[in-house]
């Protein structure tokens, strides 16, 4: 890793090295180019920046804490573990950071309708939330499989006034929901704003979502300086599409002393066909408007992803993550369903915090590493969301396990 500037991308064509770009239908290209112009103008507009700051502070509740996980640190017996508490945001996850930014852009562009895709439901809830706040109709595309395992979030979206469209094609998960949302966008391009929930899609979405989420890393930098007087030694975050991870990582990319680790969903193991680890088990290809690493078969067809976590159940990854993987600035590893569940239980019992199953993947990797590190090593884990939405999944898993009682005692 000889490069020192990792934060300059994307280029004018939306590329991070060979990844990213704009692979969209001809009817969408004018809108995508217009969105890029509007976003560049908004970034330079003091009024837009002021409005963003207002909603971050008074609506989302930022800054959220950087919390020393004392009992988890004692349990692991090594590195000093901090949690960046994104689950304390309004709506219970990092997703609202991006949704506020995009709805302000939609308003700026005169759009009258919002659409979004969702997997775990947290982006759907955040989109429905900002739609309600700004008085816009909202349609959420959600895979039928995900609707079954995320009933609480489906009800929350309906309470907030959103229309939920179940997607039964494919595996009925996030990939399929995104396909349907893109079809809607092509059909209703004039009045509709597509509020993409992760650092994927055609340019400018990967960079735009990253920028709206970078508040996570910026706050972490300031808070760690206040608490410890220096930068952290390592950062760990779960990666599906990768927006919470990119939000934490990006402000630190040019700080060579900071080790950065992204954690993919290993499912039943990367050596099986039931995982969602695009970087560790995929190859480059094009999906949903950008070139990135994807889970594909030998004919280039997208294969099914699997994870116990609905939010990581996606057969691709944001293009900037693909680039950071290739230039070796970020290390990407995978955690299995079982490892994530174990970490989920430990976090509940040791810290009194019920994390999302997505977050539990990052916690599992943090616990693995912390044990072998010095006690002056400062580690930050992005606590990307709370686990209320995952209660049924965890209950079902516990009920199916033969040794449930032994694990709980």
From Swiss-Prot:
Xref: SUPFAM superfamilies: Tryptophan synthase beta subunit-like PLP-dependent enzymes
Keywords: Amino-acid biosynthesis, Aromatic amino acid biosynthesis, Lyase, Pyridoxal phosphate, Tryptophan biosynthesis
Enzyme Commission numbers on file: 4.2.1.20
InterPro entries: Trp_synth_b_CS, Trp_synth_beta, Trp_synth_beta/beta-like, TrpB-like_PALP, TrpB-like_PALP_sf
UniProt enzyme class: lyase
Molecular-function GO terms, alphabetical: tryptophan synthase activity
The keyword Nucleus belongs to this UniProt entry's keyword annotation: no
Requisite cofactors: pyridoxal 5'-phosphate
Swiss-Prot/TrEMBL catalytic activity: (1S,2R)-1-C-(indol-3-yl)glycerol 3-phosphate + L-serine = D-glyceraldehyde 3-phosphate + L-tryptophan + H2O
Pathway info: Amino-acid biosynthesis; L-tryptophan biosynthesis; L-tryptophan from chorismate: step 5/5
GO cellular component: cytoplasm
Coiled coil, from the record: none
Residues with the N6-(pyridoxal phosphate)lysine modification: 95
Record note on quaternary structure: Tetramer of two alpha and two beta chains.
Protein function: The beta subunit is responsible for the synthesis of L-tryptophan from indole and L-serine.
Recorded family membership: Belongs to the TrpB family.
Designated name of the protein: Tryptophan synthase beta chain
Organism: Pseudomonas syringae pv. tomato (strain ATCC BAA-871 / DC3000)
Originating gene: trpB
